[in-house]
Amino acid sequence: MHLKTTLSVLAIAAVATMAKDYSGAELYTNETWMYGKFEARMQMAAGSGTVSSMFLYHNDSYLGGNEPWVEVDIEILGKNPSKFQSNIITGYGPSDGQPNRKITSEKLHDIAPASNQSFHTYGMEWTPNYVAWTIDGQVVRKTVKGQESGCKTEDGGHQQSYCNQVEDLGKKKQGLRFNLWSHEDAGWVGAWNDNILPVYQFINWVKVYEYKPGEGDNGSDFKLLWTDDFKTFDTSRWSLGDWTFDGNRVDISPNNVYTKDGMAIIALTKKGQESFTGQVPQDPEGDAMISGSSQQSSSSEQSNPTSSSSEFNQFSSSSTTDAIRPIRTQMLNKEVRGKVNAKGARVNPNNKANYQVDFNF
């Protein structure tokens, strides 16, 4: 129901403003796909008021109007880390003169041990005929084309007697994203108390599979495309968010994503305290899952960083293994094109001077 977005609030045309008291983070793929299987080995963040997520998203969903909204979610709502929320979002977002026409189908699922106490393998399978969510290889939800249920309008939550979300997801390609932030709706995520900060989401590895009906691995319909173990940061594969949006109490900051000891780390901190100084949790079971896999497309050792608009900065350290690596995106060639956020709400309802929204990534 409460959507992530891909926007930056600007104080002056092409200059980013970080006006909120907290910093979150988002990591997303440069590539998008039409169908596939997506897995990530993660220990999620938790704490009342937080959202720790993995999701698929069509990059232009926020435009609204006649641009379809296409999204599939796994979200840990910090008030209850023993459950996760699955969701499909389709329909059309609001735009000038048009209402919010998005449709959601949220469901809750148990996780044991709790998502912030242990690593789990989270997965999403997206095909023309179904969408499935998995935890540690077990299917916990499968939504089949023509059999969708529990659909509601996002604006007002009115029940829909019919929805064709699986078919509608096929209108656009999606990229894979991870983010950590805090929503202002306490009823959804829990009451906020910043004494919990900092909190972290740890990503051991990510696997992306192509949809290849009848030609996949081990007789499946999915063929492994690449595995990233985050021993280094692949700027040709990943970019970092640098934006905020209505209802979010944090600024999404590129300064709050790190790699350390073969782990990607997404942080939620107080503003000005963007850092990771703790110990990386161990995940021997997850390490074993990829220890025998080919390194052909594993991490960035074979990547070409100059092909990406992101730059990779490493703290000076006598030990590459122990170095924490903050990764920053360059804000280049920004184009200001509107005054609404990804949810379609105006970010500047009082028409203050020099307040615009950047729709570039």
What are these regions (language model features)?
Residues 1-19:
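Fungal secretory targeting signals
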Residues 2-3, 11, 34, 39, ...:
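Generic secretory/membrane-interface signal
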Residues 11-14, 87-88, 323-326:
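Generic short N-terminal amphipathic or hydrophobic helices
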Residues 18-292, 340-344, 357-361:
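GH16 jelly-roll
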Residues 281-297, 301-306, 311-361:
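Fungal extracellular Ser/Thr-rich, low-complexity intrinsically disordered regions
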